[in-house]
Amino acid sequence: MGLSNDRIKFNVGGRIFETTATTLANAGRDSFFGALFDENWNLSQPGDLFIDRNPDCFAVLLDLLRTGDLNIPPNIPERLLHKEAMFYGLIDHLRTAKWGPFDGNRLHLSRSVTGIAPGDGTAIRAGPDGGCCIAHGSVVHVFDWMLEEHPTINLDYQRVNDVGWIDSGNIVLSACERLGRGDGGMGLFSSSSGELRYKFQVSHDNQVKSYSAGALSFSPDSKIFTSCKGRSNEYGIGVWDQSTGKQVDFFYESPGWSLGDADKLQWLSGKNCLLVATLFPRKDNCYISLLDFREKNMVWSWSDIGFLTMAEEKRVRDAIAMEESNSICVVNEFEDLGFIDLRMDGGGSSVRWSSRSRLMKSKMPDEPCYPKLALHEGQLFSSMNDSISVFCGSDWVLTSRLKRSYGGSICDFSIGGDRLFALHSEENVFDVWETLPPPII
């Protein structure tokens, strides 16, 4: 490396590059270039520096540091550029330049991935770094943010009920117990190798029991929640510590209420409670409750028992809590949105349906999928058939809709890592939606 004032020269694969210390400092302390600076961000002088790497990729990455813009010539494979970015510690810079901060109203279809499994998908979950995982029966396919598939996780004919990310390197799977086998439950797997790292056990009366694990949720204080079904009416919500893997609590299901069969769990940080929703058609009736594990108390509950005088279309198919408005949003099979008031026990015993949200006037497909809900940074998302609707504002006005031309109905979708992933039912395909990076002014 040669120094002339603020100018720096590199020999990369036989090509000479000249840049400035200011440009290199944009790479950050943890990068390859960050090691060239002392603790006060003054450049050290190791002499001439030869880097035996690809010069074409180096030129792209240097331009990225200089301008913040990513321009990839057609002769450079993206896989090679990603590999070089990892060497220089610039993978986060590259990812940030490829797509911008998530905005449901500015999403565009970036890519569709096909042919990953036979049969219908169970769930798709977005990872924290832009990757995803997909459960198909007893198999889970894992993709990194470059959408390259990692080794498959196979549970040997145990059906996977749910899957969730602890962090970019670890995935939790919940599975059914197989009759007479004593397996099932919940396990922690490596996202990169598919290796089982830990199996979470459940104990009742100080005895380890077999169980089926269902819906998953995670809290910021490193707790894992899952709905549990045991053999001796041991139904309820189990709680484990992510760090130790040990069970720390269990909320037992009371007679006349449903917890162990829950379709959805959601941790509410503001209320320090867990939302538990058991929905039709898993049960004949819908049960939604908030559990406070500090007091072992169900602090709020709602059910449609005794209130089903309405048409079948008013059955609740998904639910999500909205803490800022003290309400729970629900959706029926025609994408009518409904709202239940959390400030009243039992929600006032009724759902305030918003008929103006009904969007799908066309004929239902042969194999419709139940609608799903998601809430992300003040935007509400609802899937219906082959599209996803985006609602915004205090009145939840429809502002945009995501739709592609093939793949069939959307059976699940997930938001994370500044991406939206949509899993289709009729074809082995999932879509990746991204927000375009802001223009360079």
From Swiss-Prot:
<dbReference type="GO" id="GO:0051260">
    <property type="term" value="P:protein homooligomerization"/>
</dbReference>
<comment type="pathway">
    <text>Protein modification; protein ubiquitination.</text>
</comment>
<keyword id="KW-0833">Ubl conjugation pathway</keyword>
<dbReference type="InterPro" id="IPR015943">
    <property type="entry name" value="WD40/YVTN_repeat-like_dom_sf"/>
</dbReference>
<protein>
    <recommendedName>
        <fullName>BTB/POZ domain-containing protein At4g30940</fullName>
    </recommendedName>
</protein>
<dbReference type="InterPro" id="IPR036322">
    <property type="entry name" value="WD40_repeat_dom_sf"/>
</dbReference>
<dbReference type="Pfam" id="PF25279">
    <property type="entry name" value="Beta_prop_At2g24240"/>
</dbReference>
<dbReference type="Pfam" id="PF02214">
    <property type="entry name" value="BTB_2"/>
</dbReference>
<dbReference type="InterPro" id="IPR000210">
    <property type="entry name" value="BTB/POZ_dom"/>
</dbReference>
<dbReference type="GO" id="GO:0016567">
    <property type="term" value="P:protein ubiquitination"/>
</dbReference>
<dbReference type="InterPro" id="IPR003131">
    <property type="entry name" value="T1-type_BTB"/>
</dbReference>
<comment type="function">
    <text>May act as a substrate-specific adapter of an E3 ubiquitin-protein ligase complex (CUL3-RBX1-BTB) which mediates the ubiquitination and subsequent proteasomal degradation of target proteins.</text>
</comment>
<dbReference type="InterPro" id="IPR011333">
    <property type="entry name" value="SKP1/BTB/POZ_sf"/>
</dbReference>
<feature type="domain" description="BTB">
    <location>
        <begin position="6"/>
        <end position="74"/>
    </location>
</feature>
